[in-house]
């Protein structure tokens, strides 16, 4: 009964209005009250503030400043090697493995199609058929900046409006086509491992999704799909990002999905469902 009620509430709640309210509140600078909220949040979610660039709670004047805190440069070493890809974020592996032609596993008993995830871009979807995928869930207490698994040249970015269902394990197991329904920002890169997609999926009370090159992508939330195409390497002003470099962030949590083309990489064996991962750890490698 409680399970059904939790699911029903997700459909009934005014998702976008609640998200706007949460974003507004998280940006407020309320002095002592803000400090108390940050301390309670950090204690409840066991945030290791000693890893942050600024280790005093008083350094953060709003909740969002704390939530998108930067880490010290020495706490997340980036695995070396030209053939090595690294985990793009702190989080928990929700699912990973082979894409079954065009189907991606969401949770036991649930899958969704590449074309649905990629906003109907059928030619783009075909590039990833029978490839590999990794879905990483960022819990509220995790570090919420997202980095590059490998060197890449940005090819295009697509903003897809959508629902804002919660994306934790419970809802992944109970809301069909969750990641293909939720608001998301799709970033496509050309890499030494072929085309790579890094998709930042929104959720309930995710105030904003931002990228390094564009700032808040979803700030206007016009309700239409928007697409941007970027210069190739060798052209004027390409956007080139290095392995381990920051590429985006979430203001209040969510999920990162990585897609890789077929026969280019082998995912690391430790990527088991429910396993805790850290930015910079080995995600996979190119077979020799």
From Swiss-Prot:
GO terms for cellular component: plasma membrane. InterPro entries: PS_Dcarbxylase (IPR003817), PSD-B (IPR033177), PSD_type1_pro (IPR033178). It is found in: Cell membrane. Pfam families: PS_Dcarbxylase. GO terms for molecular function: phosphatidylserine decarboxylase activity. The modification Pyruvic acid (Ser) is found at residue 254. GO terms for biological process: phosphatidylethanolamine biosynthetic process. It catalyses: a 1,2-diacyl-sn-glycero-3-phospho-L-serine + H(+) = a 1,2-diacyl-sn-glycero-3-phosphoethanolamine + CO2. Is synthesized initially as an inactive proenzyme. Formation of the active enzyme involves a self-maturation process in which the active site pyruvoyl group is generated from an internal serine residue via an autocatalytic post-translational modification. Two non-identical subunits are generated from the proenzyme in this reaction, and the pyruvate is formed at the N-terminus of the alpha chain, which is derived from the carboxyl end of the proenzyme. Pathway: Phospholipid metabolism; phosphatidylethanolamine biosynthesis; phosphatidylethanolamine from CDP-diacylglycerol: step 2/2. Keywords: Cell membrane, Decarboxylase, Lipid biosynthesis, Lipid metabolism, Lyase, Membrane, Phospholipid biosynthesis, Phospholipid metabolism, Pyruvate, Zymogen. It is a peripheral membrane protein. It comes from the Bacteria. Binds 1 pyruvoyl group covalently per subunit. Its EC number is 4.1.1.65. Its cofactor is pyruvate. The active site is at residues 90, 147, 254. The record marks 253-254 as: Cleavage (non-hydrolytic). Belongs to the phosphatidylserine decarboxylase family. PSD-B subfamily. Prokaryotic type I sub-subfamily. Heterodimer of a large membrane-associated beta subunit and a small pyruvoyl-containing alpha subunit. Catalyzes the formation of phosphatidylethanolamine (PtdEtn) from phosphatidylserine (PtdSer). This is Phosphatidylserine decarboxylase proenzyme. The gene is psd.
